[in-house]
Amino acid sequence: MKKRLVAGVDSSTQSVKVVVRDAETGELVREARGSHPDGTEIDPQIWWEELTKSLSGLLDDVEAIGIGAQQHGMVVVDEDKNVVRPALLWNDTRSAKAAEDLIQDLGGRENWAKATGSVPLAAFTVTKLRWFAENEPALAKKVTGVMLPHDYLTWKLTGAKANPTTDRGDASGTGYFSASENKYKNEILKLAFSRDLSVPDIAEPNAIVGETKEGIKLAAGTGDNMAAALGLGAESGDVVVSLGTSGTAYAVSDNPSFDESGIVAGFADATGKYLPLACTLNAARILSAAAKVLKVDLDEFSKLALASKPGAGGLVLLPYLDGERTPNLPNATGSLFGMTRENMTAENFARAAVEGMLCGLADAVNALVELGVNPKKVSLIGGAAANPAVQKIATTLFKVPVAIPPVAEYVADGAARQAAWALSKEAALPNWKVSDTVLLEPDYRPEVLEAYSTSFKALHG
């Protein structure tokens, strides 16, 4: 019997990746990729052009496609659905003051947590809308609607004919959608932009939302973290730490979360459940930056880090190289503590960089635990998860076993799995197996986290 094929897309900050998989088994058939320019804002047309290049010749026998994409990006359009300005991305922190203002305008953090499950940060779409309205009022007057990156690409694949759609997972990262109530908070959208805006319709998790001009069915799509959870096959209680451009720690949950501290965002997942999540702006690029300082490649950097002992000889790096989201320090810079003549070695500096990256995410996992998540293991994914030093040092910072799934494009895989689900018209997701996962037992060293916490308090209170 002929295989039924589906495609999944990961449109991220730096690249686009496409996989084609067997709809029933998840077996990889073929793949492609393209690149995006680095930065904090981008013309969405670049995403579209790179996507169409990557899809060229790839979809001849594909029956359905799903789009996973970076969360939070602000794509604003006029009444003819023309893009009005370059999209502001999740890593653009110029809306930090707008976030503070919005928190006050709604009466404080508790009110935000009750209304949307999250307290807005500079990454959230709602804060970008406020910044845009205040700083570019002439352009803002032209705007009638707002979309997210995956909404825009899915809509473009329909030939820009259908009404834009989104899913509750990606919508929950905007700051104007309630995952627990499953609806937009239009009063918050108006609070941010001073007038009403059109927003994409919320599609069911396994819906078909349209077709391409070739007749390929389009799944609802979702945000990158939600898609990665799908690609991994994460279930309730599973904790995932993703180490890409940013770092995220999240768990699939049966219950919504409401964290007024703002550390954990109360997101939805892509299946009808919830995905409480904490995000750091700084992850894999910390390692690249540290390796550049040492004038070594990442392989040699990993060897240097492993040659040092837990605690890096007393060196502690707070790696806020691009500001930080968790903790909420958008204007912070990196800081190195504990330097002496004896401990300033390449080995200790390399290990301090890895420990600094992972300590922030260990704190994020602990925040999930405080909200009721009971992890049995932590799965490491993303580009930096393949680094041997990252894998080994992670066992010293998490209290539970560390799972290392095989290297894969889990966001694109999750989008493909969603497409297979929509194509099947079944109530249950297709059972795609993730094999060859390595499980590392914990070697927990609380003193490393304690030193990190002490350094943080000394500088940031």
Model-identified regions with their sequence ranges:
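Glycine/Thr-rich phosphate-binding loops that ligate phosphate moieties of nucleotide
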Residues: 1-33, 67, 71-104, 138, ...
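Gly/Ser/Thr-rich active-site cleft segment
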Residues: 11-13, 112-223, 319
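Short beta-strand-to-turn element immediately C-terminal to the catalytic PLP-Schiff-base lysine
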Residues: 21, 75-78, 132-134, 155-158, ...
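N-terminal phosphate-binding loop and adjacent alpha-helix
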Residues: 29-61
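Signature tryptophan residues that serve as conserved aromatic anchors
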Residues: 47-48, 90, 112, 131, ...
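Phosphate/pyrophosphate-binding loops at sites that engage ATP/ADP/AMP, CoA/4′-phosphopantetheine
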Residues: 51-64, 135-140, 186-196, 364-376
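Active-site nucleophile and cofactor-binding loops and adjacent substrate-binding regions
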Residues: 64-69, 88-91, 116-124, 143-149, ...
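ATP-dependent carbohydrate kinase catalytic cores
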Residues: 169-274, 311, 344, 389, ...
